[in-house]
Amino acid sequence: MATKIYPKLFMKNTAEDYLQAAIDTAEWIDTLVIKTEHGRIWTALPDGQDGYREDVPLFTPKSMYDGSAGIGIFLIRLYEATGNQRWLDEAEEAAAHIIATQVGVEWYDKTLHSEVKGIIPVPGWAAGSYNGPVGEAYFLEDLYQVTGKQEYRDFVLRTADVLLEAAVRDEKGYHWSDQEDITADGGFIVFLDILYRKTGIQKYLDAACEAADVIAKDALDSPHGGKFWKLLDLSMIDFEKETTFPNWSHGTTGTAWMFAALYKDTKKQEYLDLAKAGLEYAMNIAVGDENGRLIPYQDHPVTGPTYDKYYLSTCHGPVGSTLAFRELYDLTGEEIYKKWTIELSRGIVKAGAPEKHSWGFWNCQCQCCGTAGILEHFAAMYEYTGEKEFYDYMIRTADVMLSDSDHRTPGQRTWYDSWWRTIPTRIVSYVGLYVGVAGCASSLLRTYAVMKGKKLTNLYEYHFFE
């Protein structure tokens, strides 16, 4: 018996294991690089894989969701974690291509006012921050903060000015699209507010408030108490008419988060009242107790909340919705919001994650819908609370994330998953930040940073907590 052999399989993962996994992922991503005359982009996924690209309005080459802007944010984090100039150089190459191919107001005119084809035909999402120029601006603002190079801030300001030019004023008010969720117009408002905080330029806050006032008028009284929003017509994507999302990316808690952020900069009481009313609604339809709570996936005026369906990550789950609760606690000091931030976070684990899959937590690893988003959240929750409970959840999730990866090629690592919940057999390896392996590795970097006491660039959703 080889008693002196102690295999690595018996050993616990260390912070260095998480860091090395992120480095190996960056090496894999670089196998898909496309050098351009201006810099670099990446192909969305390896040749021969049956994944999405232009048929989804979030999967475009420069997007923050799946393209070079998001990968660039991951590379900034990798540079911050390692100090290796290579990763910053690659991020700047991605930025150079984005700057050289910057679009104007005509891009919004075309995207918002022509037919959006594909499987998600929603104009506001096609133009929104995860897919369009605003996501590119988030990346370049992050680069500006790291390098101090004025060309990056100049790009951000041009992007914001084009966004203002693209807005319309009509009988509805000041807006861009017919979709008001934070993946569409609400996300533009958040961007303008963040930019105001960073620059102090008043016109950006003024525009954010004017657009937010349109959404404020659309608040609806809920029979459960509080207020909710019907932010878009979900029959566009084959849901029953009048269906609404209660959670973050396309729903009420995301809108509450937006209003809470605006209240911090304006002290306009209506914004605080709307944020509180939105979370009152969410709390009133939630299930669970102090050991774990969840907010249902959908609501409908006839059939009510979907008490058999729950997401667990960012888009429709606690990871996203807790952003609003945490923001309101920071603004008001009212303990109920911190309490719910903690209890919704516990709901993720009570539902079986990260080990157990369920209806709204399937074989998906990404920041948007899956394990990476949960890991990012638990790292943030440990920093926020200092509680060992969330440190342990973070390590559990990081270990599951690492174990689900493919590292058969020495020095490279990737993940395979199903981004589209209703097509579980479509297993591919996307490169992007919110849909793919850059997001997986980025959340491992976040874990490494917490363990080592390092500060990394935040994903945009966490900028308000800086």
Stretches found by the model and what they are:
Residues M1-E466:
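Glycan-recognition and catalytic cores of secretory/periplasmic carbohydrate-active enzymes
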